[in-house]
Design a protein with these regions (language model features):
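Short, well-ordered beta-strand core segments
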Residues: 73, 99, 117-118
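Short beta->alpha connector loops at strand-helix junctions that form conserved
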Residues: 40, 77, 103, 118-126
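Short, glycine/polar-rich helix-capping loops at beta-to-alpha or helix-loop-helix junctions
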Residues: 102-114
Length: 149
């Protein structure tokens, strides 16, 4: 399964993309659902973890409970330095779980813990987010094309 995470606009992108992988990207494409989940979608879990542990662990705790060896963690961060995304990427790497980073700028600290890095070389948050969605939609459309052949 795909496990997405991100903060703010990147959290919205994580939810958006998880839904499209699970349901579909294009209205006339009928394909099997792909297992995907956003770690940024459950406000009770996010706030309980932030309160009881620390905000830097809000993705790590659920990932530890839900992830399996064949999963893929997709971290989305326009700075590449979001501590909670960095912590879960490091943990995934330590467990030999594949990691993909949708990153901005030079990739920040997160780039060192991503098997695949999709970096947008900009410091403009809006442009980075637009490029992240474009890239993610392109990848999903390609996957859907393969699934319906």
């Amino acid at each position: 399964k795909l496990l997405f995470c991100g903060n703010g606009g990147s959290a919205a992108d994580a939810q958006h993309l998880a839904a499209e992988y699970l349901i579909r990207l294009r209205p006339k494409v009928n394909r099997r659902p792909l297992p995907a989940l956003s770690l940024a979608q459950d406000t009770s879990t996010l706030t309980a973890c932030g309160n009881d542990y620390d905000f830097s662990n809000i993705f790590l705790r659920p990932f530890q409970a839900l992830a399996s060896k064949n999963d893929i963690l997709i971290g989305i961060t326009t700075s590449g330095n979001s501590l909670n995304v960095l912590k879960v990427l490091k943990y995934a790497r330590s467990k030999k779980i594949s990691t993909i980073g949708f990153l901005g700028g030079a990739g920040g600290k997160c780039k060192n813990f991503c098997d695949i890095k999709l970096m947008v070389p900009s410091d403009n948050t809006a442009r980075i987010q637009e490029c992240h969605i474009f890239l993610a939609h392109f990848i999903l459309q390609s996957a859907e094309d393969l699934l319906i052949k």
